[in-house]
Amino acid sequence: MYTLAGYESFWAFLLIASLVPVLAVGTSSLVAPSSKAAEKRTSYESGIEPMGESWIQFQIRYYMFALVFVVFDVETVFLYPWAMSFQQLGVLAFIEALVFVLVLIIGLVYAWRKGALEWS
């Protein structure tokens, strides 16, 4: 029979970890002074008066670069623990990591061929 008896500390930590941000945001919204002045609604550009529209659309290529960065950043997060315990894991873990990296390389080559990484 499956039981949740051994997970009290996990649930307590999860509850506390969920309540802390909610309480912090709620407290700051209640305590913080609110100002409706026009100066507060303008965008900040390094102390210079804003010129033009503050809402501009970024081209899609920026999002593609950000997406590729996130994919390879997550790859690094997954491969670091594997590299730290490489000797204990054996050949099967090496093959699994190799397949993981190959799938990512295939995805990178596909994005490259489709022109997703072209700047112009």
Curated annotation (Swiss-Prot):
Chain ranges passing through the membrane: 10-30, 64-84, 89-109
Molecular function terms from GO: NADH dehydrogenase (ubiquinone) activity; quinone binding
First-listed, main subcellular location of the protein, grouped into a coarse class: plastid
Keyword tags: Chloroplast, Membrane, NAD, NADP, Plastid, Plastoquinone, Quinone, Thylakoid, Translocase, Transmembrane, Transmembrane helix, Transport
EC number: 7.1.1.-
Subcellular location: Plastid, Chloroplast thylakoid membrane
Biological-process GO terms, alphabetical: photosynthesis, light reaction
Keyword Chloroplast found: yes
Catalytic activities: a plastoquinone + NADH + (n+1) H(+)(in) = a plastoquinol + NAD(+) + n H(+)(out); a plastoquinone + NADPH + (n+1) H(+)(in) = a plastoquinol + NADP(+) + n H(+)(out)
Keyword Membrane annotated: yes
Topology term for the membrane: Multi-pass membrane protein
CC per GO annotation: chloroplast thylakoid membrane; NADH dehydrogenase complex
Pfam families, per database record: Oxidored_q4
Family: Belongs to the complex I subunit 3 family.
Subunit structure: NDH is composed of at least 16 different subunits, 5 of which are encoded in the nucleus.
Record's function text: NDH shuttles electrons from NAD(P)H:plastoquinone, via FMN and iron-sulfur (Fe-S) centers, to quinones in the photosynthetic chain and possibly in a chloroplast respiratory chain. The immediate electron acceptor for the enzyme in this species is believed to be plastoquinone. Couples the redox reaction to proton translocation, and thus conserves the redox energy in a proton gradient.
Name assigned to this protein: NAD(P)H-quinone oxidoreductase subunit 3, chloroplastic
Organism: Zygnema circumcarinatum (Green alga)
